[in-house]
Amino acid sequence: MFSETHSDSQRADRILASIRREEARPGRGLLKIFFGMAPGVGKTCAMLEAAIQAADKGVRVIIGVAESHGREDTMRLIGRLPRLPMKKMVYRGVEMEEFDLEEALRVKPQLILVDELAHTNVPGMRHRKRYQDVEDLLAAGIDVYTTLNVQHLESRSDTVHDITAAPVQETVPDSVLAEADCIQLVDITPDQLRTRLREGKVYSAPQASAALDHFFKESNLTALRELALRIVAEKVDHELTEVRTISGDRSIWRSGERLMVAVGPSPFSARLVRWTRRMAYALNAPWIALSVDTGVPLPPE
């Protein structure tokens, strides 16, 4: 009885939350997050390319802030869109530049690009965090494109620290990701990212060399990539569950994914089974473990 009541309550909460979001939608901007496992995967370029496509279709686009980090490809894309002047601030005797929220609200484009969602603003700005600036833009009816790395997601920062041993100073609440209208995963393989580092396309040579041996070790990147993929899969699954609940017809929303893991005498079999089970849970998919017996005795070693 308890489980049934609890399930009904959860279903009601989901429907109510959806209704509230729909009621709040008129006049509110849309948020799209370009999400990746680490710096250098191409989030800013993907955001700029999507914005250029929107501008070509007649959307009034402006860059609020886009960080090139000296990367030529990024700078070329930035040059193809109008850009809002940065706001100059003096902090502890040093002149710094920040996103000018007030000017963005005055200009009020249809779409604005605000890079590095987890950024902490200089003291004296309207908000302490950039994601709070984004909230004001959305409330004003402006669509926003932004970027985020997995290590900056609040609930995963400890996990990332355990993986990389690198402290995470800036985080974004999970609610920001949960309420985003669209998340685009920007994904490359760990080997491709390490190649970009060696070619100087992410950091300068001395910094890149140190990064390859620490944060950007292949094992770290593989774990971060799995984490990013899992987060996006979980969000898609939650959205699908919500739609199925509201529709009242679960049968037409079956995604069809099934997972199979092949196991054998390898010492890694247990780890493979655990990984498959986690992925099946994230995808809400059935899974099986398969072992093939060829009838041939295994060698002594």
Please provide the spans of the model-predicted regions.
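Internal gly/pro-rich beta-alpha loop/helix module
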Residues: T146-A210, H214-K217
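Extreme N-terminal, non-catalytic leader segments
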Residues: M1-F34, L229
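Loop/turn-to-beta-strand initiation segments
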Residues: R60, K108-L111, A140-T146
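Conserved ATPase-coupling elements of RecA-like P-loop NTPase cores
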Residues: E116-Y131, S155-D158
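Long, charged amphipathic helices and adjacent flexible linkers at domain junctions
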Residues: A208-F216, N220-M260, P297-E301
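Substrate-engagement module of ASCE P-loop NTPases
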Residues: K129-N149
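Conserved P-loop
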Residues: R28-D100, R106
